[in-house]
Amino acid sequence: MATVNTDATDKDISTFKVTFTLVVSGIECITGILGSGFITAIYGAEWARGKTLPTGDHIMLMLSFSRLLLQIWMMLENIFSLLFRIVYNQNTVYILFKVITVFLNHSNLWFAAWLKVFYCLRIANFNHPLFFLMKRKIIVLMPWLLRLSVLVSLSFSFPLSRHVFNVYVNSSIPISSSNSTEKKYFSETNMVNLVFFYNMGIFVPLIMFILAATLLILSLKRHTLHMGSNATGSRDPSMKAHIGAIKATSYFLILYIFNAIALFLSMSNIFDTYSSWNILCKIIMAAYPAGHSVQLILGNPGLRRAWKRFQHQVPLYLKGQTL
């Protein structure tokens, strides 16, 4: 059985590392919570009023709500793993954090992939029968695909609760330079089971996202070149919008892949628990949903207008509270 074993003591993490990790990841998580919470509130309010959400808005609601839960959970895990290490390294608590983290991450990756597939089918233009068929059927199939994604995410995250992670704390490790003892935190990870269940849960949405993003970039690039050849000029608003969409899609594609890699490295315990590399993985994992939530608000005209109204109303509300 291929396992990865790591151990750490309280001395292995400095006050600076704890503070740095909590501050940076905390800012990212709070940004993501505000962004995802705002999107959830906007579309959730429409859904609560009995309105039928368009397919794109429905995906956005599912994605933003799952991201809201993910960022809250990630913030809790960072606090427990850095400040309450004895509690966090109890086997049941540790496994609970890992399984829910994987489930929420897998759900997010699926929803993000479906959002990109939907926009690709709506915006891109390719003369292929399969592409036209998917274009016609996607609106009908999407609600079922979203439900299936949650089920698949659960199916490949719940098995991680058994025979994958094992952690324990030894509180009586002698210190050679003195007569005292120290706590040592041990972790074992079954890499065979982790790689299987993690890859099975992430492989399909990852390929879907890369393929949809690539097709969308190619279609937008081709259309941009066509507009340029017609001498519309780089100052044309439509061309600027296309170039902006290409940049945004490329940026999110890179962030999506980095997040998937960081999640796997963090889950596998390849790096020491409190090493700089593991801290970097935590920061990347928090940056991905926060960055994309901000991009969704800035890139969506309706959300952008709602955000401006919200920014205008908050000072008025606070001013009214002080009177």
UniProtKB/Swiss-Prot annotation:
Keywords: G-protein coupled receptor, Glycoprotein, Membrane, Receptor, Sensory transduction, Taste, Transducer, Transmembrane, Transmembrane helix. Glycans are attached at N170, N179. Residues 1-14, 80-100, 163-190, 269-276 are extracellular. It is found in: Membrane. GO terms for cellular component: plasma membrane. It is a multi-pass membrane protein. It comes from the Eukaryota. SUPFAM superfamilies: Family A G protein-coupled receptor-like. Pfam families: TAS2R. GO terms for molecular function: bitter taste receptor activity; G protein-coupled receptor activity. Belongs to the G-protein coupled receptor T2R family. Several bitter taste receptors are expressed in a single taste receptor cell. This is Taste receptor type 2 member 40. It comes from Pongo pygmaeus (Bornean orangutan).
